[in-house]
A protein has these predicted regions:
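The serine-hydrolase catalytic nucleophile loop
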Residues: 130-142
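Conserved alpha/beta-hydrolase
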Residues: 146-164
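Conserved acidic catalytic loop of the alpha/beta-hydrolase fold
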Residues: 177-197
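Conserved hydrolase catalytic core segment
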Residues: 196-235
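A catalytic-pocket lid/entrance helix-loop region that shapes and gates access to the active site
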Residues: 222-267
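Alpha/beta-hydrolase
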Residues: 255-343, 350
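Short beta-strand/loop motif that positions the catalytic acidic residue
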Residues: 348, 354-356, 360
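Catalytic histidine-centered segment of alpha/beta-hydrolase-like enzymes
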Residues: 388-397
Length: 414
């Protein structure tokens, strides 16, 4: 009996233990099931959050990309609106304003013409560079009123400025062709405005072509005017420029530009200086205040006026830059280097006048003054314009226009 009772007790204990184990296991299983459900829900929630975040990022990236693409398009649109391609006009009934491209000797040439009175004498401005359109400065600097005394013709040579096109024949840009073009343009203007002669003014690099053309055909011109006249491409020119820049940088204590200056030149045994990098030299010249526009950088004096000019359309501005770059690589660029007009052009049959800014060391005014003193001509005079560097007509238009008016009065009827 005792053994049976003991077995019953053991059975009850085992049954109770088994029941406890079963209930515990069920509880654990339920907790594990609940735990799994929680984890799965959290994972699903986190995944949904991740997908939402990715969608948000994608949307933001699309917006950023659209903005990046839109900014240059907006700027291009604004630039196009700033570039209507229109030139000055006048209220006077007898005035003339024109902008056009025409064929000269088989190549496109561009013209800007401004004049308040058609009876005024014609002044042909032979552009700088060669390859740089100068009407941009007339567009930028509104105080210049030369058109009150002359019918002013700004000439863009073949394939430059508004005459540039993608079929430009760079091989045709030679000194002989440009001299022949100058003669043809002169004859066209004489015929169009019913004039026996005209005035011709060469500006900077354009003075090389204009001076040679006046020597070839003096019968076409009342007078020669050299503004920022190129006199020589010799070491003497480089030396005068160097001495000016060195003096300015030393007075400023500008060690950085002094170092750049020395890197750009070679000191010769003769005591002269030879420039090894013209573009660095000109950049330093602007820094020193003797460049295109006094006390203005190359960007301020040249690039910004081109960008903001109203006289060009957007496509014409692009053509302007392409043409300018093309001209630097032409045969003309080689043919007009290594010159010295003190040796090759010592006499003119027409009156000769020279206009330089007091701070012009691109074409140093001292060399221009000395050239004026040595050249033989029926009349001659050197004008030094205060407050100006390389572009006196636009930097100090009042004094420069007064000088040109005086030239007209002394030569037109004399």
């Amino acid at each position: 009996m005792q053994k049976a009772a003991a077995r019953d007790k053991r059975g009850c204990f085992l049954f109770g233990a088994a029941d406890f184990i079963r209930k515990t296991a069920a509880s654990i299983k339920l907790q594990l099931h609940n735990l799994d459900n929680v984890k799965i829900a959290d994972i699903i929630f986190e995944c949904r959050q991740c997908q939402d975040w990715r969608r948000i990022v994608r949307k933001k990236m699309v917006i950023i990309i659209l903005c990046i693409l839109a900014v240059p398009l907006v700027l291009l649109g604004v630039w196009a609106l700033m570039s209507p391609g229109k030139i000055r006009t006048y209220k006077e009934s007898d005035s003339i304003s024109g902008k056009f491209v025409m064929d000269i000797n088989g190549a496109p040439n561009g013209f800007f013409i401004n004049g308040k009175y058609k009876d005024n004498p014609v002044l042909l401005l032979v552009s700088s560079g060669p390859g740089t359109d100068d009407y941009v400065f007339t567009d930028k600097y509104k105080d210049m009123k030369l058109e009150e005394d002359f019918t002013v013709v700004y000439w863009d040579y073949r394939y430059m400025g508004i005459a540039y096109n993608n079929n430009a024949d760079a091989d045709s840009i030679t000194l002989d062709n440009l001299l022949n073009d100058t003669e043809a343009v002169t004859n066209y203007l004489k015929e169009r405005f019913n004039k026996d002669k005209i005035y011709i003014m060469g500006f900077s690099g354009g003075s090389k072509i204009a001076l040679m053309e006046v020597q070839r055909h003096p019968e076409n011109y009342y007078a020669y005017i050299g503004m920022a006249q190129c006199v020589t491409d010799s070491e003497e020119n480089d030396t005068v420029m160097y001495n000016f820049m060195k003096d300015v940088f030393e007075r400023r204590g500008d060690k950085k530009n002094l170092a750049r200056l020395e890197e750009a030149v070679t000191h010769l045994d003769s005591g002269n200086i030879k420039c090894n990098d013209w573009y660095v030299y000109v950049d330093l010249l602007h820094e020193a205040g003797g460049g295109t526009i006094k006390d203005k950088s190359e960007f301020e004096g040249i690039t910004w006026p081109i960008i903001t000019a109203k006289c060009y359309t957007l496509s014409e501005k692009i053509g302007y830059v392409k043409g300018m770059k093309m001209y630097r690589k032409t045969k003309l660029a080689e043919e007009t280097d290594n010159f010295d007009y003190r040796k090759t052009i010592t006499e003119l049959e027409v009156p000769a006048f020279f206009i330089s800014g007091e701070s012009d060391y691109n074409c140093p005014w001292e060399l221009v003054r000395d050239y004026c003193e040595m050249i033989k001509a029926p009349q001659k005079h050197f004008y030094k314009i205060q407050g100006a560097a390389h572009s006196p007509l636009w930097e100090n238009p009042k004094d420069t226009c007064r000088a040109l008016r005086e030239i007209k009065e002394n030569t037109l009827y004399g």
